[in-house]
Amino acid sequence: MQSSSSLFPVALMSAERRGDLVEDVYRLKPGNSPDATVELAVTRLGLVDQARPRGVPVILLHGSFSNRRFWYSPKGIGLGPYLARAGFDVWIAEMRGHGLSARNATWRTNKVADYARYDLPVIGAFVKELSGQVPHWIGHSLGGTTLAAALGGQYLGESDAASVALFGSQVSRYYWPLKIPPVQWAGRLLLRSFEHISGSRFKRGPEDEPVGVALESMRWHGLFGRFGERDNHWWAGLANVRLPVLAVAAEGDHQDPPWACRLLLERFGSGQRQFLSLGRRQGFSEDFDHVRMLISTAAQEQVWPRVLDWLQQRPVGESLPAAEPPQGVAAET
């Protein structure tokens, strides 16, 4: 089968009509990470009767224990369809082992560093190749954290993103016992006995998370820990990011509280930074929580239009020359 990309092997898994929407699902097999079995599913949404060329691309990244359905329900409801109906070219990525993305051979040890270093750059490159424009990126929870890691680690740059929006994303809230080495060691030893953390068992969401993500988070928040890799300080690297950045927090979010979301925003060196907290004190109908900030009737009425305004106020992505494969990816011949 002929690849849908000149950058790396890509297969069109399905092309379906969903009401007023067109849904194309692609499977990317970039082969750029140490685990060559990694495959990533990306869903593209557009309008059936779209007479003009597709609009500016927007890439949506789900959080932990989640998948594409966070952005796009089977009934065609969600921020993804909303933006598609507003004329944007919507792309919904699913991380390794989530949704339509199969579990790779080393799935148990997957971590944010892998997503940021290997996966986001190839997703962005593929979207740029097919759309011919620089995409906007929107991430929720761990999706936003991964996006921050990719930017701070310089795996994504200004040529890869027109703007960034982070919803309920932070790395500053921690549990003080993790700063005590014996507690940290015991926790890591316990986690290593598991392959994954069950989303359904702990009522966190429909997907499981690899234990590698949890171990990585413990390292970030341990004594002398930091947001980054051993050889790449993402937290410090955010100061060099000049892209427009929107950070959205929810007043009722106890998992990723507003003060921590604001701290992450303030690390960015961009001169175009906006912070929005969703609560009654700010004029909203409720104190939104971690999920309702994007999935609720109230969010549909009060939050989604804010996202649309943010995107429409950003400069339109320029047309691009033929894309080159990200570092570590061999072009298809």
State where each predicted segment sits.
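Short alpha-helix in the alpha/beta-hydrolase fold that links the catalytic acid
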Residues: P257-R267
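Alpha/beta-hydrolase-fold enzymes
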Residues: E129-Q133, W137-I138, L142-E229
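Short beta-to-alpha linker loops that shape the active-site pocket of alpha/beta-hydrolase fold enzymes
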Residues: E94-H98, Q170, R281
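Alpha/beta-hydrolase active-site loop
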Residues: T109-E129
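Short beta-strand/loop motif that positions the catalytic acidic residue
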Residues: V241, A247-A249
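Short, surface-exposed "cap/lid" segments of acyl-processing enzymes
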Residues: L47-L100
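Catalytic active-site module of serine/aspartate enzymes centered on a nucleophile-bearing elbow/loop
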Residues: Q274-T333
